[in-house]
């Protein structure tokens, strides 16, 4: 294997995981903060807000998992070799 291709694949894998986690991380923090604020304003709607929050967090976390899958594909099933 060409060492330059291997080094580029490792750097790309790191960038894939890093960049794929920035957006969902910010989004999850914002969503959780807004959910806490909403529960503080309307405590009787806690169940509905919590359910919606958990579903939203799962969808946001899926984006990070896609970045991890791309990184693992670059590291272990490298198409550039």
Curated annotation (Swiss-Prot):
SUPFAM superfamilies: F1F0 ATP synthase subunit C (SSF81333). The chain crosses the membrane at residues 3-23, 57-77. Its main location: plastid. Pfam families: ATP-synt_C (PF00137). It is found in: Plastid, Chloroplast thylakoid membrane. The record marks 61 as: Reversibly protonated during proton transport. GO terms for molecular function: lipid binding; proton-transporting ATP synthase activity, rotational mechanism. It is a multi-pass membrane protein. HAMAP family: ATP_synth_c_bact (MF_01396). Belongs to the ATPase C chain family. This is ATP synthase subunit c, chloroplastic. The gene is atpH.
């Amino acid at each position: 294997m060409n060492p330059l291709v291997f080094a580029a694949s490792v750097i790309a894998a790191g960038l894939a995981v890093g960049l794929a986690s920035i957006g969902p991380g910010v989004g999850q923090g914002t969503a959780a903060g807004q959910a806490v604020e909403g529960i503080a304003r309307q405590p009787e709607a806690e169940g509905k807000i919590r359910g919606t929050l958990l579903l939203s967090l799962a969808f946001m976390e899926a984006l990070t998992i896609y970045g991890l899958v791309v990184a693992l594909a670059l590291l272990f099933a490298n198409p550039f070799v």
